[in-house]
């Protein structure tokens, strides 16, 4: 039964009952007319003047020819030569139905569904052809043999949608008390040979994007794009001169205004810290003239020639020392070990540190070259010439012997070594512990500087203790250059570096606009008691600073890690004390030898005083026993501290569990 007539697509909808179920179907009119010729309506077709009149069954033939041409145009295929209909007077009308009978049946029996399927198939073929052309074009631009080819294509497509506005020398230099910037280095030869991918994008002068590869449960790979914002962002094409122009150069004038300036490079081993601070490397040889050390010295001597500073008669001195495993060594004095003490005025003094007077940039370059040749370094998986210590180069201005200003340029050790606190090698553990502690303390000191806090936890590490005067005072300025590696293999360390730098910069905003900000240095008495009970430490200045430092970084420092840091600090203090006492005993032993030699010479006399000899010898022996016993007890305590450090290193949890 026909239920409806669809004039739009020239079809009818029919329904029937089969086994008690109502079923329906859509049938086009052409199929109905071909199966039921008696239903074809009688229409008078006017003959065209250009074509001969149709044969007897004009309606049928016209429809057949029309439909056959329609099908041919859809398939874009010419009909067979034998089935062509020639519009000529010579064509025999009797052969027309025979030639088109097969096409008539096929064309009229195609439903709308079949036609739609054919259209979809045609579109699908066009789409596949376009995708194939696109793949061929991509294969010309990128290396399809790369194992991370899929990630590489996703990164390239994402970068294609960005609007690039990189930092240029024409951009203005903003005034910051704390300036944080990021520098990206290019891929090195090793990363290129390993076909590592560049996952760092710097689209503008203050934005850094990290394309972190991730994998879903079904093993589908995708990108997680993380964005960070800083004061300045330098891409891999920025030279040292450009980095210096926006970072350390604005700080040079600070030291002429009786201020303290600090510029330090922070990042993973091999990310370009020493290259930025010291200069270009050619193998193990370094061109010191292109580093921030030399560029800052050049501007210092240029400023000295200005009339308003020339009349001050300032003297320029320089020091260069390193901090390795909590110990300070003078790089300009054959790596002599130095002691860091605090005088009665609470001023930190580096005992024995040599200051060299410099008259020109060439003198500075010589000192840098001497210091770099002595600096502690080693070969790692990331870098063939890896720095394992914090190097501090200071340009000091003095007026008539008194301190006028100081510029501290610091090349920090690789931040990834801070994860080596659970290593089986004690020396590696000490390196990691000192780096970990000094970086946390350095961050908190900058936070205190940015918030104008009255207390700075500089005693928490040897690095911040030496740089105490750079974090105190209204005329103190700091610049941080976070260097990052672009390779996908370094993605985790790069994110850690950027998070550290981002946390430092967050603290420079107005605390009233920063939302919920907890006070970090002033705890009520009961809270101090709670902290002492929780961390189990006494009340010495160094331990208090270390305790508060760990409390402010509770998500990064577990109680076990704090215990380890405490054990390391105690062990280092005891080591210094034991070595100092041993040196004193050695000097005393020389005096004992002289006294004993005099006693023995006295016994060679004929009538020497036996009572005097015995009394003096007994006194010498008692003094020896007392001093050596005291030294032995300290050595035993020192060995116990070594055991405690080893036990504490085995119980470290990297992160403190969050409160539920």
From Swiss-Prot:
The modification N6-acetyllysine is found at residue 75. Residues 96-106 have a biased composition (Polar residues). Keywords: Acetylation, ATP-binding, Cell cycle, Cell division, Coiled coil, Cytoplasm, Cytoskeleton, Developmental protein, Differentiation, Microtubule, Mitosis, Motor protein, Neurogenesis, Nucleotide-binding, Phosphoprotein. Residues 113-140 have a biased composition (Basic and acidic residues). One of its GO terms (cellular component) is cytoplasm. Residues 177-507 form the Kinesin motor domain. ATP binds at residues 267-274. The keyword Plastid does not apply. The modification Phosphothreonine is found at residues 51, 70. InterPro entries: KIF2A-like_N, Kinesin-like_fam, Kinesin_motor_CS, Kinesin_motor_dom, Kinesin_motor_dom_sf, P-loop_NTPase. Interacts with AURKA and PLK1. Interacts with PSRC1. Interacts with MCRS1; the interaction enhances recruitment of KIF2A to the minus ends of spindle microtubules which promotes chromosome alignment. This is Kinesin-like protein KIF2A. It comes from Bos taurus.
